Design a protein with these regions (language model features):
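N-terminal secretory signal peptides that target proteins for export/translocation
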Residues: 1-11
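Non-catalytic cap/lid and distal C-terminal segments of serine-dependent acyl enzymes
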Residues: 35-321
Length: 321
């Protein structure tokens, strides 16, 4: 076989170069198992963003109510605690007429002008548009054990929150009915009609609100539950069974939760969304005056804040405005 001078040498060098390039390429290609893992680890879908509507924002044409406080309060029922509270007074308040009442737990966050609930703004707008009655708002923090309420807490939770909010029984209901309403009632004309009293909250504040109405349906008959903690923190997971076993109470309730709210497939009693589903099912079975919305979020106030104006319209839908 004849050869061309220099070609064999050049061919050998080319073979070696191709071999080295092949090895280099193989070195950066992961094994199949790694390829599959990379394919599975796709970027997480962006979390849904709920935006506040104009009903939750200050409007030039809307008269602005007063937010008074914070005031300090030491309870004789929830012994050894001190807390803050604020009172919202709408511009349309007339002392000669009893005003409806909205009590909101975790008042430090519910009144935050930069938060996602912004309840005073919502009240300003809906009352002005006659989409809910003239309503006094009472926004209460959980209790802090001790003599002083630390200013450093800011929007954080006082240390007696879980005891007060997550516990079943009538202690917190008594605190609201026997202490807070009379305290605010010294200054403002509050309705004594339970149909004109609403109570709400988020997370543990939501189960707390339900407990107040459950224990005192002749004092409160409207409940707003946002991402409610109807879970086994302090026994709240039994509420669906209690609802089914007891005679229906005259309570209207709006339930909001997210499909990704604190999921616990290993312990359904601590799975927030499952427990909210069970609660809704029990309330439906007993034919409660119920409305509910399940969003796509997790354990966050974002969704509840975005729909709060609609919730309040529904809660007070048949009350004189």
């Amino acid at each position: 076989v004849s050869t061309v001078p220099g070609l064999t040498k050049r061919f050998s060098i080319l073979q070696i170069a191709l071999f080295v390039l092949t090895l280099s390429a193989l070195a950066v290609i992961p094994p199949k198992s790694r390829c599959y893992a990379q394919e599975a680890a796709k970027p997480a879908a962006p979390k849904p963003k709920y935006r506040l509507s104009s009903d939750s924002l200050p409007q030039e044409e809307t008269p602005k109510g007063k937010l008074e406080g914070p005031f300090l309060f030491k309870s004789k029922i929830l012994v050894g605690t001190v807390r803050k509270y604020w009172v919202y007074v709408p511009a349309q308040y007339d002392a000669s007429k009893p005003a409806c009442v909205l009590v909101f737990q975790d008042g430090q966050r519910a009144t935050n002008p930069n938060g996602v609930l912004r309840v005073p703004n919502v009240l300003d707008n809906l009352i002005f548009k006659r989409q809910m009655p003239v309503t006094i708002g009472i926004f209460i923090t959980p209790g802090q054990l001790g003599e002083e309420y630390p200013e450093t807490l800011g929007f954080s939770n006082p240390n007696n929150r879980s005891v007060e909010y997550d516990s079943l029984g009538d202690a917190y209901a008594r605190f609201i009915v026997e202490e807070m309403l009379p305290e605010v009632g010294k200054t403002y004309n509050l309705t004594k009609d339970p149909e004109g009293r609403a109570i709400g909250g988020a997370s543990s504040g939501a189960i707390c609100a339900f407990t107040v109405a459950w224990e005192r349906p002749n004092e409160f008959r409207k409940v707003i539950s946002l991402i409610g903690s109807f879970t086994d923190i302090r026994g709240g997971h039994v509420y669906p069974e209690l609802v089914r076993k007891n005679k229906r109470k005259p309570i209207r309730i709006f339930v909001e939760d997210g499909f990704d709210d604190n999921r616990r497939p290993d312990n359904l009693k601590r799975d927030w969304h499952i427990q909210n589903q069970l609660m809704v099912a029990a309330l439906k079975d007993k034919r409660y005056d119920l409305n509910y919305v399940f969003g796509e979020g997790g354990h966050s106030d974002d969704h509840g804040g975005a729909i709060l104006p609609d919730i309040l319209r529904w809660i007070f839908r048949d009350f004189e405005k």
